[in-house]
């Protein structure tokens, strides 16, 4: 059976060699037909601690690494949100009176 691959956002990188990845999916409600979002968090192995908060990453199912870790980060899809925060700070400093 092929390995499952999911794409999600890193929500925590505080633990050593582990990141928490939030994976969202959209499902149709069985009775009402409305499209609703469902999410699940996975602990994924990050050997070199190279992925940070806000990164969109691809994770791949592996053999169990620990009690809760059965996924490993394969690669980065989109860089994280720290660059956007720094850009907002630059704009706030450039405008007189802050970011109004």
Swiss-Prot record:
UniProt-listed InterPro entries: NA-bd_OB-fold (IPR012340), Ribosomal_uS17 (IPR000266), Ribosomal_uS17_bact/chlr (IPR019984), Ribosomal_uS17_CS (IPR019979)
Source organism (scientific name): Erythrobacter litoralis (strain HTCC2594)
The keyword Protease is annotated on this UniProt entry: no
Purpose: One of the primary rRNA binding proteins, it binds specifically to the 5'-end of 16S ribosomal RNA.
GO-annotated biological processes: translation
Molecular functions (GO terms): rRNA binding; structural constituent of ribosome
Cited PANTHER family: 40S RIBOSOMAL PROTEIN S11 FAMILY MEMBER, SMALL RIBOSOMAL SUBUNIT PROTEIN US17M
Description of how the protein assembles with itself and partners: Part of the 30S ribosomal subunit.
The protein's name: Small ribosomal subunit protein uS17
UniProt keywords, alphabetically: Ribonucleoprotein, Ribosomal protein, RNA-binding, rRNA-binding
Record lineage: Bacteria, Pseudomonadati, Pseudomonadota, Alphaproteobacteria, Sphingomonadales
